[in-house]
């Protein structure tokens, strides 16, 4: 979508008007300015005083959010932006009173039809003018993509690009000083959206923070379909019930927890962990565990090994890496359930085949090949040449939890390797614009058993200091040229009190416990190559 703007002649008048208005007046008078943009129609323009809840009656029920607590004083603007004759995005722009001269766009999650209101609140609290969208459809299902290529295009890349263009223009109209720098913050699908911006729209953002990025998107979905091929249903000998996954996890941790020098129930570097399962297998004279929950059979051991192994195409190329060890208990509850994953079922029904009757239990390598060949709007997001973004002066910080139970952290390693090989840059050269941090004890995007509070999203925000907050670390890198050597994470107890901190290393460095003293002391750890 092309957006043209016709406001230069009235710019001086607008500047005078802004200077003479209060923040509240400027907000309530902003509707006409929004509506003057091509293909944009305001639906809500309101001043919201901080420290109150805002009701969200139009938010899709599947988004599971009916209100949002707003921390800072903001001008809230909701609007519909037409992206084609058959598609549109719902977008919100929040303009804080405590504006710091920075613009920011946030991403989505899953199939991405939910505005991330917590991120809007989090970033406006930090002084960003922030925008977010529904990614072109409402709710968490992919059903909106059925026979709707323009809606799918919004999901693939156009929604964030449109939000950046419209959001930047509105920011310049709302604040006399405009904005100095532009940023992006997202995780999972939002991480993929960040890299899509880097690859396809290198001038949209000065700094991109992309957590647990779902790049290799098509192959990630096929891997999700492949899981059922491996586990089978609950009646098959290949299936493991949750209790057996607990045994598997305990064995993984027994073998791998101490590889980093500390017995802390965390795996710092899953690349070093190659567990075997002879010690928990049932006696060799039993082909079945007869319902025992104390040992696994040979068939079940093969299931575990396959899930931890890469998924290959028939030509020997890797489609997607296996799941990293250490994530077994949560992954078993969400992915290894003995039924096909909804993620794969919906994508193949509503995108690949446009057939609502497609049976996900029949998934095989031919389906993965069909999906990869289709790759609509290059949603794979696997371009290895990031030179346009680099030449534009952009910076990337990506992070991935080593306990991620949905998107294997090995995927971020593989993408880093792909960029390294494509651009022919050594890690120290990549460090000039692209840094990857492995976060031990972080699950998918946030939470987990370790020092996972790094400020990559609203749920993981604890401190605003650049050393403790990945978003503010990006600001310091872009605006002061100070690149982060580490990202400090904080472990909180159940009452929200800090237990310990840990400095998470930039890849390819790994964390090793050197002592002396407790592993709870961040200075007892060292980043080594």
Swiss-Prot record:
Residue numbers annotated as active site: 188, 404, 444
Single GO molecular function: metal ion binding
Record: glycosylation sites: 53, 64, 85, 98, 138, 233, 286, 290, 354
Protein name: Probable feruloyl esterase B-1
Sequence positions that bind Ca(2+): 257, 260, 262, 264, 266
Described purpose of this protein according to its UniProt entry: Involved in degradation of plant cell walls. Hydrolyzes the feruloyl-arabinose ester bond in arabinoxylans as well as the feruloyl-galactose and feruloyl-arabinose ester bonds in pectin.
Chief localisation class: secreted
Organism, as annotated: Aspergillus terreus (strain NIH 2624 / FGSC A1156)
Signal peptide: 1-19
Disulfide bonds: 27-75, 63-114, 187-445, 256-273, 282-295, 505-527
